[in-house]
Amino acid sequence: VIEATVWHKLMKRSEAKSRAVELFTFLGLPDPQHFGERYPHQVSGGQLQRAMTAMALCASPDLVVFDEPTTALDVTTQIEVLIAIKKAIATTGTAALYISHDLAVVAQIADDIMVLRHGKMVEQGSVRKIFDAPREDYTRELVAVRQKEIESRVEASTSLLTITNISAAYNPATPVLTDITLDLAKGQTLAIVGESGSGKSTLARVVSGPLQPTAGEIRFDGTVLPASLERRSKETLRNIQMISQLPDLALNPRRTIADIISRPLQFYFGMPRDARRKAVAELIDLTELPKNLLERYPAELSGGQKQRVCIARALAARPKLLLCDEPTSALDPLVAESILELLRRVQSETKTSYLFITHDLAIVRTIADKIAVMHQGSVVRYGLKLDVLSPPYDDYTAKLLASVPQMKPGWLDDIILKREERTIADTNKDMKA
């Protein structure tokens, strides 16, 4: 935190340390006197972002550039970081350039907004002006994208995936999943939501096979699913495919797009070359990718195109179940919505089931039929989307829903004000006691 300040001789080391402790305290970091003694791997993602805010503010700059500081954070962590950033900007008088693809977040932080597209300014104005009366079609699309929601479908009678009393751990002393029971019907979507560390991705690892459960049973399409990946048949492996959060890590940079998509066709079905070419062309059409991308490499594609390639490759195996692990978290809203629309259309045409993992409750509203809310390795709320997202709520689900940024300027200010009022009330109560 103090490295740049001391390096540029803006403060003495002792002064910089004192300033860092002040900022740690102000930004709500735990044990501020000793927080600076920790290493980055010893703190959470939200604490790291607040520490980086302290680093940026340490030398009292005139301008701080925030480049997507909350994109990878879950909603409850995100709101704490946003509150810290907003307070820091207001208290220090520092100007801020806040870069984000999430308009709901921008609505809480910014005074003015500039909308960019393809390197050019589309529109600029005050927050109220952009949200209440956007002039350009692109801006209107950005504002409207979070307002879409689909109705839950009537629950199908046939189960594809049944998870019964599953527990799992990475070592005997650290249980990660405890007594998970869920059911996913054929052709439907079960969304798994929760904070980082709640066990969402671990559950996906258990279903897909790399992590064996310590207790419980999983049934897939009517038969018991072997816990070990090595014991699963080739047919079972084909029927359970995954779309990862980071397509750059999932795609081989040395293979062309045609090679990447055709690989499952050769591996699972032994298709000859001509048949593979025809099947790849059909998958390209299904995922709405330009045909001229087939001979290109992943580095030559946009983020949305890479994710579509991942979807095409997964669909090449003709699976019954797709595990979607945060597939849109790194994409801007319009690209993310296009991916979600693609997944909805593919599901309608192929009747593929989705286990959809996300921390974004706005996405859940647009994709899910059923929802399971996870907290500290357990399911705390589970059912049809309408039931889970309607009151009465358990405390944790209420916290998650209350932390989703709203497309309403001033929403975060209201939360800060309520917290301050609650703090004052608690202080007065303690003094009377």
Segments from the language model and where they lie:
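Helix-to-loop junction immediately C-terminal to a conserved catalytic motif
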Residues: 208
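Conserved ABC ATPase "signature" region
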Residues: 15-34, 275-292, 402
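Conserved ABC transporter NBD signature motif
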Residues: 216-225, 236, 381
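Short catalytic/signature loops enriched in Gly
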Residues: 30-36, 127-164, 173, 385-433
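Conserved ABC ATPase signature
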Residues: 38-43, 47, 297-301, 305
